[in-house]
Amino acid sequence: GANHATHLYNAMPPFSHRAPGVIGAAHDSAHCMVELITDGVHIHPSVVRTTFDMFGDDRVVLISDSMRATGMPDGEYTLGGQAVQVRGNRATLVEGGALAGSVTNLADCMRVAVKEMQIPLESAVAAATMNPAKSVGLYDKYGSITEGKVGNVVLLREDLSLKAVIQNGRVVRWEE
């Protein structure tokens, strides 16, 4: 069976008692990891909490679904040749108004999950680090701080804002 469900809830039929669809199939496949876009736009906080409860902390992967307009000012951008309007943290297709991805980075998605969606810090950190590495078969090199693994570390302040980035054991960004 499937071992990974991309962008759970996004552009898929809803979970129903008569037709559980992708969500039900992912739940019933014991090794299936599920991705959640926790930018505060794509999925309601109660659905995020329910998904953690339903699948367990070890099967949820936080993703950003960020497009290249992430970090840019409000305005019009393109994605796959389509015009996209960015306003605040929302990116929509100019034609039709559908969500067109996210303009929130992964660190902020994790912060939103903890601060605004009440996901426990330990669960959110695992979903943003260990679980993605396990999902793609790279946990032997990435996803945790262990001797012999690649030295990539993000340091966060108590409010979960970025403090420092260490890549391959070298400090590449440090903020006072």
Residue ranges and their predicted role:
Residues D159-I166:
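Short, Lys/Arg- and Gly-enriched loop/turn segments at beta-strand edges
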